[in-house]
Amino acid sequence: MEVERLDYTDFLNEAPGRQEAFVQHLYAALSRVGFAKITNHPIPESVILQLFAWTKGFFTLPLEHKRKAAHPPQPNPHRGWSCIGQEKLSVIAQGKAVLDLKESFDMGPGDDELYPNIWTDEGDLPGFRAFMEDFYGRCQSLHLQLLSAIARSMQLPDSYFAPLCSQNSSELRLNHYPAVSRHDLTTGTMRISSHTDFGTITLLFQDSVGGLEVEDQTRPGHYMPVAADDCTDIIVNVGDCLQRWTNDRLRSANHRVTLPRGLTHGMVDDRYSIAYFGKPSRDVSVRTLSALLRANEEAKYREEMTAWQYNQSRLLQTY
């Protein structure tokens, strides 16, 4: 089974037949695997290439510069630079800590008064902040467009999910997986351990190194590689909040980053990826939505919990 690759120009096309085909293929991919690939989307190739260049530029800064933007030792605010091993996603998936071999940088919306962003000095990497704030905005626009496609695929108005995400709390994360020996990745150490994402949908940009795998939802415990064909492709995956809203019609899939398949010896190259974690407004409920219940179907997620409360409950396990 492979992750389906969809042409986004079909959704932007004025011909209703092409739009309908796109939304139905998107729903089929997300309901079957939890993942899809989007090509020919609105974010230009030149911007994505700059994105990877800025990401590499940040992670190659001297340690003392990155420490100026250090993530606090506690889970919140989920902002700034995290060193290797600071975040332990394996605690969520397995109930035990296994070192995740990555460093990361997290940011949210520029107008977030509750959790303001944490930046290194402008002089350390001039232009970095301005580029990332612009890129964040591009991702938020695409996030809402894709939610409109998902709404339409489920026979809801295109704008159905928009009010649930009106107070933006989404996060952009830059990831760097340092070069590591093949031996280290065959002895239980993951580049990033198996986990699901917390929010609505995630937009993932990855380089050509590979190693991303997604669990086959029809065969728990079996993982399949997500090919790193083109860094301009966007990998879209379902998050926990969308799973809860849809009463498991769309399910968040476990995924991890490990040894690229086919590599038999030597070193695994540095890997860079960027993830935009689309999220609901913090005060929005993550109970199952009544509009998404089929006839005679009971809601699986009935407890009253806001998106912020759910996000915090997950974050507390990772730091």
Curated annotation (Swiss-Prot):
GO terms for molecular function: dioxygenase activity; metal ion binding. Its cofactor is Fe(2+). Residues 168-280 form the Fe2OG dioxygenase domain. GO terms for biological process: antibiotic biosynthetic process; small molecule biosynthetic process. Proline hydroxylase; part of the gene cluster that mediates the biosynthesis of burnettramic acids, an unusual class of bolaamphiphilic pyrrolizidinediones that display potent antibacterial, antifungal, and cytotoxic activities. The first step of the biosynthesis of burnettramic acids is the hydroxylation of proline by the proline hydroxylase buaE to generate 4-hydroxyproline. The PKS-NRPS buaA and trans-enoyl reductase buaC construct the highly reduced polyketide chain, and the condensation (C) domain of buaA then catalyzes the amide bond formation with the activated 4-hydroxyproline. 2-oxoglutarate binds at R271. Binds 1 Fe(2+) ion per subunit. It comes from Petromyces alliaceus. PROSITE patterns: FE2OG_OXY (PS51471). Belongs to the iron/ascorbate-dependent oxidoreductase family. It holds the Pfam family DIOX_N. This is Proline hydroxylase buaE. Pathway: Mycotoxin biosynthesis. InterPro entries: DIOX_N (IPR026992), IPNS-like_FE2OG_OXY (IPR044861), IPNS-like_sf (IPR027443), Iron_ascorbate_oxido_reductase (IPR050231), Oxoglu/Fe-dep_dioxygenase_dom (IPR005123). It comes from the Eukaryota.
